[in-house]
Amino acid sequence: MAKEISSELLNTILTRVGGPGNIASCGNCMTRLRLGVHDSSLVDPNIKTLEGVKGVILTSDQVQVVFGPGKAHRAAKAMSELLGDAPVQDAAEIAAQNKRQLKAKQTSGVQQFLAKFATIFTPLIPGFIAAGLLLGIATLIATVMHVPADAQGTLPDALNFMKVFSKGLFTFLVILVGYNAAQAFGGTGVNGAIIAALFLLGYNPAATTGYYAGFHDFFGLPIDPRGNIIGVLIAAWACARIEGMVRRFMPDDLDMLLTSLITLLITATLAYLIIMPLGGWLFEGMSWLFMHLNSNPFGCAVLAGLFLIAVVFGVHQGFIPVYLALMDSQGFNSLFPILSMAGAGQVGAALALYWRAQPHSALRSQVRGAIIPGLLGVGEPLIYGVTLPRMKPFVTACLGGAAGGLFIGLIAWWGLPMGLNSAFGPSGLVALPLMTSAQGILPAMAVYAGGILVAWVCGFIFTTLFGCRNVNLD
């Protein structure tokens, strides 16, 4: 049974972030409790010393408390219940806080824009992982047992049943993204879902598959619903903005009847005329860029080496649209295993620190508590509890990840590109059965395992040689 987050711990965290009156919002991603704050000067950074807290990330308007997978959701739910009993603030306090919030938005616009991706995609990640694991296990069984694609019987039926979830997810994914994106940008979710469905419909009357829209051009202009996720994100943003403008001038009595109607008509027109072509060009450009980086060993090394820094700044969710674009263009996510090497490099760095530390030191205890999650692809406990506070090991961990990325890039350059079978999934050792390639699942698993091994070894060596000098090993 999952261990609950104690109310004492949450009350202590609440006190150290300035009390209920300093909380602007409460949410979570996969591993972090995210508390929006009005005044960051009231936040005590020593939250990270509390037992049960694996790390803390502070920005100008947000406190991110690292708990780990599963626990973050429970912490956010319990914290929301605590905040439900918070005292109401007076108008002067609210006005002062709004001023501070506005200033914070002006100084962290890029970070807040990228945070939108977390709002859009984080609710979908458990589904990505579940569908990807089922597909990976089914593919592995079919490969090992040599089950033909057209085989009949109980086992083939069971394997097809395990694969159907991935097909369903990716067939209708744009609708889920459209719904979440419209809400994230301040609009109505169902309007975003309807607009996203326009990208899913077919506009070729001669096609024998798909869902025909009923027309093949838009008042004589050709329709080309390319761009998929990129176009849907742009369209959902436009839909939310248009809805806000329409609602501003709509009488209250007509709001429910006409606001969505007018919003959909205007947004759909923009989608057919501008957004679909624009999304297609952006999609092709993004796919070309990252496919060429993926096939360039040095590009892979740079991507893997910098990914831990993206995690620290909380902008790693910005890669998810790229993952989806690569799934559309390649049939697998070739970027994800490259970026996963960052976590493997950190495991090697942590093992080096453990080796160099004193037998009964606090550092060894910290590594023991964080190494298993690290091996399984959950890197935050190692980042915030072990490597980042000591800085040099964090740098050598990045170098270890870069070495793993270089290895995968070299293998792709030599003719065996591989990737994740889903847009998103677990990293670390858990991701092994999710790897796939044109040559099959077993070669892809071997390449990924080789990359992890290279990152472990290089992270260990770099940290032993360069990451332990003048570093606190107690």
UniProtKB/Swiss-Prot annotation:
Residues 1-123, 179-180, 239-260, 323-334, 390-393, 462-474 are cytoplasmic. It is a multi-pass membrane protein. The keyword Transmembrane helix applies. Gene3D superfamilies: Glucose permease domain IIB. Keywords: Cell inner membrane, Cell membrane, Kinase, Membrane, Phosphotransferase system, Sugar transport, Transferase, Transmembrane, Transmembrane helix, Transport. SUPFAM superfamilies: Glucose permease domain IIB. NCBIfam families: PRK09586.1. This is PTS system N-acetylmuramic acid-specific EIIBC component. It comes from Shigella flexneri.
